[in-house]
Amino acid sequence: MKPVTLTTERLVLRPFEPSDAPAVHAACQEPDIPRWTSVPAPYGVDDAEQFVGTVAPEGWRDDTTYNFAVASRADGSLVGAMGLVRLARLHTPERQAELGYWTAKEHRGRGYTVEAARAVLRWAFRDLGVERLEWHAEAGNEGSRAVARKVGFHMEGTLRAQLVREGIRRDVWIGSLLPSDLPGESGASGSVAPGAPDATPYLPYPG
């Protein structure tokens, strides 16, 4: 897929560029990012250069991951990363993807991650035809869960022993979002609305 750019009131979500490597490297030195994400630790300059120069563009080209650099419209600084991952089921009857993100420490607490997530959700549902979006995080990642809840994800439970990190099995929280979950929010920049009905009929279990 050809990379796209999304714009919100305060942010630009654009493809990563080679010039982003220093900012990505600096952000990923903060311990919470490798602790709660798949970012390796220690995270070197070579890792950042490979991510922005190879991994991110290949994800768009191969339709395996759609990663956005989240940047401030005010000064161009890198706020974080956000994208759709695990896209193997996007072009199957399940029409499913997973939302992932991290935010640089100095930009947390300002609503940027929620604002960016709403733009990506809208794009996923409207333009990509996603019918079920999932959120996964290692159990205990309260910051990620707070963002997921704010954009409307329904918490579905805990996947026991689903993740192996540092040779230890760990639990994973899972949430889901359907197009029909989204309320209308006309006029708000970066809003997801109007919530479209699911394209494939949905028969929820009545029990």
Stretches found by the model and what they are:
Residues 1-34, 67-207:
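Acyl-donor (CoA/ACP) binding surface of acyl/acetyltransferases
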Residues 58-63, 153:
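Short loop/turn motifs at secondary-structure junctions and domain boundaries
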Residues 57-59, 108-109:
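Short helix-to-loop capping/linker segments positioned immediately adjacent to catalytic or ligand/cofactor-binding
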Residues 34-54, 66-68:
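Conserved GNAT-fold acetyl-CoA-binding loop/helix
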